């Protein structure tokens, strides 16, 4: 394994530890707002790893806001006792980027719990599909993620199914260049080398929603390991 990928894996392991600590510290409680939870996680990340830099905006979304994709900036909701919420943070550990997303269910709603399980199972199914196909475009993987949503009886909620990840500061991911994303217009092999002749690394993100019930779930981590 090349040193570049090893650093990305180390960064992700730290992100995973941060997310576990969120639960251990009891930060996920009803009655607080999304912004308050966001600030608490920011403070926890600083205490654990001295993190102050994030390569994308920090996302905490609860209730109907879990329907919203990354680009939107919905109203600040208060967490309810039976809520579903997801957290999507992109912390930078010693100049290496992580991008980690998880979903949590505060109450005992079985449909919400099913959604939280389904997105994790779908993520691993997506990785297995990627690993099986030694040549695969972003469009092909995105289409498969949509097929998984149908299999689990949800709707795929994102315009993308993932993106490139790397060393900070990396070249900005231009939204107009779909080859940077797991996107229906990306016809390039995801395993193609970059302009420097180096391997590219990808994040896979699964966002399933039920628009009628106004719930969504999100699961995200490093794909190319």
Predicted region positions:
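Active-site neighborhoods and metal-handling regions in enzymes and metal-associated proteins
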Residues: 1-225
């Amino acid at each position: 394994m090349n040193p570049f990928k090893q650093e990305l894996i180390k960064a992700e392991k730290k992100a995973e530890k941060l997310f576990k600590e969120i639960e251990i510290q009891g930060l996920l409680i009803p009655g607080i707002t999304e912004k308050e939870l966001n600030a608490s996680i920011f403070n926890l990340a600083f205490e654990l790893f001295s993190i102050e830099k994030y390569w994308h905006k920090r996302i905490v979304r609860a209730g109907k806001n879990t329907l919203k994709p990354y680009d939107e900036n919905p109203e600040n909701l208060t967490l309810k006792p039976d809520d579903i919420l997801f957290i999507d943070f992109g912390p930078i550990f010693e100049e290496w980027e992580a991008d980690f997303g998880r979903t949590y269910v505060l109450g005992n709603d079985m449909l919400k719990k099913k959604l939280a399980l389904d997105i994790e199972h779908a993520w691993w199914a997506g990785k297995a599909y990627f690993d099986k196909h030694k040549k695969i475009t972003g469009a092909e993987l995105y289409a498969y993620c949509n097929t998984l949503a149908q299999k689990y009886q949800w709707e795929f909620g994102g315009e993308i199914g993932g993106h490139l990840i790397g060393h900070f500061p990396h070249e900005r991911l231009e939204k107009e260049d779909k080859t940077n994303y797991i996107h229906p217009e990306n016809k390039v092999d995801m395993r193609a080398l970059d302009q420097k002749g180096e391997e590219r690394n990808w994040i896979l993100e699964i966002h399933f929603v039920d628009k009628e019930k106004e719930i969504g779930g999100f699961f995200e981590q490093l794909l190319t390991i």
